[in-house]
């Protein structure tokens, strides 16, 4: 039995520019300085947004939490502020903020319109350049205030680092409860900070490997019901509609969307025990075989431009990482060091491939360039697995099992800094990161 609850998300938000200055000294100074592991976070002062109720405090708190969690910003203690912002539309006294060494200053206000909507204004100031960097006005329904806060954090992140933000996103994952020998696994989705958790399935079937479309708020995943062959589904997140795209006699492994969202690539177990890669066209349902081998080919992922595929295969004796053209030609092994490699996934920027590596009883999350060079291990532990990229290619998410404990979800910066556990109500595994919601 599958939960039939429909999930509605109305994302309609109107955005206007308040005022945007020309190129600034802060942006010039900060861009290009955040790639090293010894980077010092940017000091930033985020004031409470002026409002007649608590909504302004809440929005400022979410913006602060987003930026602090990125590891690239150091939100300053409000107790240190010399100036109280009562009119966010006027220019601040920059010398007050220079005293506490803030490089950026965020001010804002929230007004309830006569039609019930919220009007949220924010401004980002260059403290030492004495000018405004960014100004935006948002109109939205009251219940969408958290999403507006994430969008503001994205604007600040982008302006002060030169990279795209990733806060206006969601995570789909497997929620796990119950004893280890009778685990209940439910499909769940939440905001990237752990808020707004919703269960998509009820635990009556085994669900595995949820993956987001790179183009839509849509996921694909596997489901196993008792005494039934494996099913592969598409699920529309906004409307809660689920569509069966395939029922397979043998085991199906790790379905994932192509870069244009028009196909799903998956590994199908053969009668001889091997597993080969296939694609399914989502419009015609036609299957195309890409690999023919007596080995196990699995965990395929497309390059951002859709021309190449990376996957894991044990055709050389133990699991290694291979790339090939999207039609299956030009096969190349790219992993060359000791250990077994699995779960490769291409960065949205195309510059790295993330992977899981097993060596000497430890599981690591690492990255390498698409030609296999420049391998770097970001974190190592008892059991780390299943990396997934933020849409800006800056942050990785994965799940970890510690001895005697259930799995939890973690994030880490591509430099290996800023490893953090993501709050979930229960054990959680197999996360997948959505594209930016405001790009849908």
UniProtKB/Swiss-Prot annotation:
SUPFAM superfamilies, per database record: TolB, N-terminal domain (SSF52964), Tricorn protease N-terminal domain (SSF69304)
Pfam families per record: PD40, TolB_N
Principal subcellular localization: periplasm
Cellular compartment(s): Periplasm
GO biological process: cell division; protein import
Domain of life: Bacteria
Signal peptide residue numbers: 1-28
Keyword entries, A-Z: Cell cycle, Cell division, Periplasm, Signal
Disordered, as annotated region: 417-440
One cellular component term from this protein's GO annotations in UniProt: periplasmic space
Role summary: Part of the Tol-Pal system, which plays a role in outer membrane invagination during cell division and is important for maintaining outer membrane integrity.
Entry's family note: Belongs to the TolB family.
Self-association and partners: The Tol-Pal system is composed of five core proteins: the inner membrane proteins TolA, TolQ and TolR, the periplasmic protein TolB and the outer membrane protein Pal. They form a network linking the inner and outer membranes and the peptidoglycan layer.
PANTHER family per record: PROTEIN TOLB, PROTEIN TOLB HOMOLOG
Protein name: Tol-Pal system protein TolB
Species per Swiss-Prot/TrEMBL record: Bartonella quintana (strain Toulouse) (Rochalimaea quintana)
Lineage: Bacteria, Pseudomonadati, Pseudomonadota, Alphaproteobacteria, Hyphomicrobiales
